[in-house]
């Protein structure tokens, strides 16, 4: 069975507000409660929530340095300077480069893009990239999804006669790089109203500002939004505020008139066209785009996303898909090796963390493997492999509530470099320092982690009876999308549930359950459910015993036909209490 989870029911929303909103909107009180949980308390707020409007996007010139950035881009275009669009090799970086490059290529042919090689140059702005720009006569570099800590690189570029505009969304340090403009909504001196844009989102605000300044119709930017929603979903930024608007219209573009490269990814992923969701991007499209940078080169991803014809897009997409299949094969093998190491006591850490090292593991998948180990053991996790020049590189993933970045930062004197955020980080150190690092970070984690952080939690939004899941309920619930951080798919709890006798094990190894569930109080209302990695409950369920289930409600499409299904988050035998 999977790691046992703790179920926590959210506090009930204010009953009077729920009742009023339910009456005003004519909706089930459970749906009204979900709205109040999301900060929606009035009819007007509900209308804005259910009907996102591009007119409500913030003025891009509210972002610090935006006027300087727009002016410098314009001077480069009218002065016939060469512009280099430079971005990270992950999905956020490659979509950002594709978006800004696609926009500027309409205005100048003196433009190119650059994605650093993951294993040669590493993350962010590189000296090699700047040298390449200088050798090829570029006068302006626009960085995307990177650069906020590239102080020395900016100075280096300036010494070679190259100006830089930084578009980033990561937390800056005390000293901001001395670039022509630094666009980052997380700058302390930036008054922009929404600070959780993706890197691609910051790039979009730049092209929005340029268009606004020089009379380019906003409508011409809408085709770029399919790139932006892929970035928002894949980088796991909040799907609230401005991101909710951008994601909503990005999905409309992706499901209506996607660019050739994304259409190829949809086809190669086996997804149903016109019904793509945030989850589809997170689990199907994003990993494929990421595979280019993990296994080959991020440049291939930009070539895919900027392809102008279907044949080219499908050719590149097919190659990227093959890289993704290779990535999955390597991922499975290394995950099993890492699990075996932990289970046989070959960890480099004690009981409060999971740290493993194998010099032969592929650097492109250690982050994925770290996530798998968190799922298995629910401890802060770092997976290391050998890099080059006597260095080891690691990818870190944390559990809810524990700041692993802070733990890594406490060992910074042992590191060559590191970066990331609360729950995910990357780091590099000399192999000779690995033992000392493991000992120190284990001590740091042991002193700060509490038992509550070591048990995964299922947050239950509301109790629900199956009889409430009507076509109207589903239609309104669908309007809560797009789901994501800050607006997660609601999780419901239904008690005293049985399988109708048709339940079975599914999956290559029979590890999952496909069930037809009924509730004792409503025996004629049955609903399909899928429970991943829960085959351990099969004997209990097959014997006709009751369970309680936590789940979200999803729509699955097959050949254009929608089917409602419960996606089970966790289940308990009926004698256990919440």
What feature does the model see in each segment?
Residues 1-79, 230, 284-322:
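Cofactor-/ligand-binding subdomain signature composed of acidic, glycine-rich
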Residues 35, 88-90, 142, 168, ...:
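Divalent metal-coordination and catalytic microenvironments
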Residues 135-140, 146, 151-294, 298-304, ...:
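Functional cores that coordinate and move charged inorganic groups
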Residues 382-398:
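Short glycine-cluster motifs
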């Amino acid at each position: 069975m999977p790691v046992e989870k703790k179920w926590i029911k959210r506090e009930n929303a204010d009953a009077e507000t729920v009742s009023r909103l339910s009456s005003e909107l004519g909706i089930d009180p459970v749906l009204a409660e979900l709205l109040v949980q999301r900060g929606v308390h009035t009819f007007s707020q509900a209308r804005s929530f259910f009907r996102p409007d591009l007119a409500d996007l913030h003025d891009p010139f509210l972002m610090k340095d935006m006027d300087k950035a727009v002016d410098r881009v314009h001077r480069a275009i009218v002065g016939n300077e060469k512009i280099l669009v430079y971005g990270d090799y992950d999905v956020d970086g490659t979509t950002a480069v594709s978006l800004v490059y696609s926009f500027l290529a309409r205005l100048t042919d003196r433009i190119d893009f650059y994605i650093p090689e993951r294993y040669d140059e590493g993350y962010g702005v590189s000296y090699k990239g700047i040298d390449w720009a200088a050798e090829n006569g570029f006068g302006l570099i626009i960085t995307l999804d990177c650069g906020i800590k590239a102080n020395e690189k900016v100075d280096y570029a300036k010494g070679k006669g190259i100006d830089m505009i930084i578009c980033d969304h990561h937390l800056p340090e005390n000293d901001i790089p001395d670039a022509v403009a630094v666009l980052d909504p997380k700058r302390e001196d930036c008054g922009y109203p929404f600070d959780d844009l993706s890197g691609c989102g910051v790039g979009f605000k730049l092209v929005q500002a340029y268009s606004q300044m020089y009379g380019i119709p906003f409508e011409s930017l809408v085709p770029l939004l399919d790139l932006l929603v892929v970035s928002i979903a894949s980088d796991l930024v909040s799907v609230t505020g401005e991101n909710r608007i951008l994601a909503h219209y990005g999905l409309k573009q992706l499901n209506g008139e996607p660019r050739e490269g994304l259409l190829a990814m949809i086809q190669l992923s086996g997804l149903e066209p016109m019904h793509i969701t945030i989850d589809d991007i997170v689990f199907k499209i994003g990993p494929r785009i990421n595979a280019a940078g993990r296994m080959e080169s991020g440049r291939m991803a930009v070539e895919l996303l900027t392809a102008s014809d279907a044949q080219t897009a499908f050719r590149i997409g097919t190659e990227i898909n093959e890289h993704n299949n290779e990535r999955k094969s390597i991922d499975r093998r290394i995950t099993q090796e890492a699990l075996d190491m932990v289970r046989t006591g070959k960890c480099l850490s004690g009981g409060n963390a999971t740290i493993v090292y194998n010099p032969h593991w592929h650097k492109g998948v250690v982050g994925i493997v770290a996530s798998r180990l968190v799922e298995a053991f629910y401890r802060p996790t770092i997976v290391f492999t050998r890099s080059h020049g006597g260095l080891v590189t690691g990818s870190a993933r944390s559990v809810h509530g524990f700041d692993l970045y802070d733990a890594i930062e406490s060992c910074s004197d042992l590191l060559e470099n590191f970066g990331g955020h609360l729950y995910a980080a990357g780091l590099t150190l000399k192999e000779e320092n690995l033992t000392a690092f493991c000992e120190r970070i284990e001590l740091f984690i042991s002193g700060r982690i509490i038992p509550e952080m070591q048990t995964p939690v299922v947050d239950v939004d509301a109790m629900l009876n199956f009889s409430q899941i009507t076509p109207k309920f589903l239609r309104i619930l669908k309007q809560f999308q797009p789901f994501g951080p800050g607006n997660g798919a609601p999780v419901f709890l239904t008690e005293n549930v049985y399988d109708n006798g048709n339940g079975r094990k599914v999956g290559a190894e029979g590890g999952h359950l496909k069930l037809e569930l009924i509730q004792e109080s409503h025996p004629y209302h049955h609903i399909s459910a899928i429970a991943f990695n829960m085959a351990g409950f099969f004997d209990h369920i097959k014997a006709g015993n009751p369970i309680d289930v936590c789940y979200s409600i999803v729509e699955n499409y097959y050949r254009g036909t929608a089917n409602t299904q419960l996606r089970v988050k966790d289940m308990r035998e009926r004698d256990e209490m919440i």
